[in-house]
């Protein structure tokens, strides 16, 4: 929660500690510049779009450390996201759609 994040931030920063407190989102990924790109992209796709993003551990926020990291992630994720097939999932034999609308 935001209240917990504010408490952690104020307590740690009062002691000169470097802090990142991101309490408003349910889950987030922090991607460092030296991250394995293939593993990171696969984890983001599964976490963000698996179960149509509706499970309790879904990944709604990705924080890329550094502008280069962000640009690389965007370039790698964009074609994969655009290729997702969204449509009705209740029809028998519907193997074309990867996820239904939520």
Question: Where do the model's predicted regions map?
Answer:
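ALDH superfamily catalytic-core signature
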Residues: 2-102
């Amino acid at each position: 929660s935001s209240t917990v994040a504010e408490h952690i931030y104020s307590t740690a920063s009062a002691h000169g500690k470097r802090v990142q407190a991101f309490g408003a989102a349910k889950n987030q990924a922090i991607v460092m510049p030296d991250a394995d790109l293939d593993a990171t992209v696969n984890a983001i796709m599964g976490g963000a779009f698996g179960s149509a993003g509706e499970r309790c551990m879904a990944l709604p926020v990705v924080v890329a450390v550094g502008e280069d990291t962000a640009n690389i992630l965007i370039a790698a994720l964009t074609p994969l996201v655009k290729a997702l097939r969204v449509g009705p999932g209740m029809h028998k034999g519907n193997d074309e759609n990867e996820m239904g609308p939520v």
